[in-house]
């Protein structure tokens, strides 16, 4: 029997309302016991004194670029970033080449991630064949192969009849539709429509591009009974629309990218193309509304939208590929809300663990007895810098490059096996 004890840590597990100093006994990859002063002579010991111990983090929005664009990232490099950031499970988006609209690609991803053996990689399937927005993909075979949700992420589904059909099918299968809400007739530009786009003379992406689609798909979710999950929510009005539907009992959830909590559109003036992302960084009032949405529970989870691009793809704002890496910086970014007294550590951990697990319908994000021993151990006060030495991605596109970050994962354990040590 393989046995491991995580000793002396401060354990926080929102799924069980558990908080305090405990030891955790792991046996054969499962949580065996949580108690004070566990003694098992033959067990391996991890001393977590002074550290936070919680369920393994789950990121339900990651771009691994594999297959097809592995010069930016691949399953191995992305998995290394994930475990360094405390993520034991990640959900990969289907805008690969070829896209995840067939079981061959699903099997490739699952087999390669198993071979890498770091974090759990769960694929999503496309809503439409080729992500072209016209013909529904084969949801049944994709789910059977291992897809946990469906999305055309990176592109909106503009045809309302297609989205309605997708929600109906997903409802039958008990999986969510992950919704990239940007009306492409209003979101054809580069950065947020506002003072910075005017100052720089750049084409813009109107906030109503997001808001209109959220309203439409909230109505469709209400009519079909399907679960719509709004990706990377970014505006104040978007949150008000989501709250409206939640109050009516509609199956609607949403995520926020930590970058939208940290930065406004003005970050483009500092970081240039590394601050270009879709949906774009918004105004201060939107950022503050998102923070309030986290505090009030309107926003269900954090999700990085980890989107790697090479330096040559990020040279000029107007021609740059949109996206920011985030797997290694998610924890210190979210901890800024804790340090400012906006949310508790328990709330922060809830948004990284049990909440995303519930959204995708997996029995993870918990330390309950018998569950997979996915454990993240972190120091909320350790300072570090994201640079050439610490970055594990193939790409470096983030406004946080070279910045001092506070909060560091020390150990990541997946299925009882240590997959990362600082």
Curated annotation (Swiss-Prot):
<dbReference type="InterPro" id="IPR050138">
    <property type="entry name" value="DHOase/Allantoinase_Hydrolase"/>
</dbReference>
<keyword id="KW-0862">Zinc</keyword>
<comment type="pathway">
    <text>Pyrimidine metabolism; UMP biosynthesis via de novo pathway; (S)-dihydroorotate from bicarbonate: step 3/3.</text>
</comment>
<dbReference type="Pfam" id="PF01979">
    <property type="entry name" value="Amidohydro_1"/>
</dbReference>
<feature type="binding site">
    <location>
        <begin position="63"/>
        <end position="65"/>
    </location>
    <ligand>
        <name>substrate</name>
    </ligand>
</feature>
<dbReference type="GO" id="GO:0005737">
    <property type="term" value="C:cytoplasm"/>
</dbReference>
<dbReference type="InterPro" id="IPR004722">
    <property type="entry name" value="DHOase"/>
</dbReference>
<keyword id="KW-0378">Hydrolase</keyword>
<feature type="binding site">
    <location>
        <begin position="322"/>
        <end position="323"/>
    </location>
    <ligand>
        <name>substrate</name>
    </ligand>
</feature>
<dbReference type="GO" id="GO:0008270">
    <property type="term" value="F:zinc ion binding"/>
</dbReference>
<dbReference type="GO" id="GO:0006145">
    <property type="term" value="P:purine nucleobase catabolic process"/>
</dbReference>
<dbReference type="GO" id="GO:0004038">
    <property type="term" value="F:allantoinase activity"/>
</dbReference>
<feature type="active site">
    <location>
        <position position="305"/>
    </location>
</feature>
<dbReference type="InterPro" id="IPR011059">
    <property type="entry name" value="Metal-dep_hydrolase_composite"/>
</dbReference>
<feature type="binding site">
    <location>
        <position position="278"/>
    </location>
    <ligand>
        <name>substrate</name>
    </ligand>
</feature>
<comment type="similarity">
    <text>Belongs to the metallo-dependent hydrolases superfamily. DHOase family. Class I DHOase subfamily.</text>
</comment>
<dbReference type="GO" id="GO:0044205">
    <property type="term" value="P:'de novo' UMP biosynthetic process"/>
</dbReference>
<dbReference type="InterPro" id="IPR006680">
    <property type="entry name" value="Amidohydro-rel"/>
</dbReference>
<feature type="binding site">
    <location>
        <position position="309"/>
    </location>
    <ligand>
        <name>substrate</name>
    </ligand>
</feature>
<comment type="function">
    <text>Catalyzes the reversible cyclization of carbamoyl aspartate to dihydroorotate.</text>
</comment>
<dbReference type="InterPro" id="IPR002195">
    <property type="entry name" value="Dihydroorotase_CS"/>
</dbReference>
<dbReference type="InterPro" id="IPR032466">
    <property type="entry name" value="Metal_Hydrolase"/>
</dbReference>
<feature type="binding site">
    <location>
        <position position="153"/>
    </location>
    <ligand>
        <name>Zn(2+)</name>
    </ligand>
</feature>
<feature type="binding site">
    <location>
        <position position="305"/>
    </location>
    <ligand>
        <name>Zn(2+)</name>
    </ligand>
</feature>
<dbReference type="GO" id="GO:0004151">
    <property type="term" value="F:dihydroorotase activity"/>
</dbReference>
<protein>
    <recommendedName>
        <fullName>Dihydroorotase</fullName>
        <ecNumber>3.5.2.3</ecNumber>
    </recommendedName>
</protein>
<keyword id="KW-0479">Metal-binding</keyword>
<feature type="binding site">
    <location>
        <position position="95"/>
    </location>
    <ligand>
        <name>substrate</name>
    </ligand>
</feature>
<feature type="binding site">
    <location>
        <position position="63"/>
    </location>
    <ligand>
        <name>Zn(2+)</name>
    </ligand>
</feature>
<feature type="binding site">
    <location>
        <position position="61"/>
    </location>
    <ligand>
        <name>Zn(2+)</name>
    </ligand>
</feature>
<keyword id="KW-0665">Pyrimidine biosynthesis</keyword>
<comment type="subunit">
    <text>Monomer. Forms a 1:1 stoichiometric complex with PyrB. The complex exists as an equilibrium mixture of heterohexamers, composed of 3 PyrC and 3 PyrB subunits, and dodecamers. The complex has both DHOase and ATCase activities.</text>
</comment>
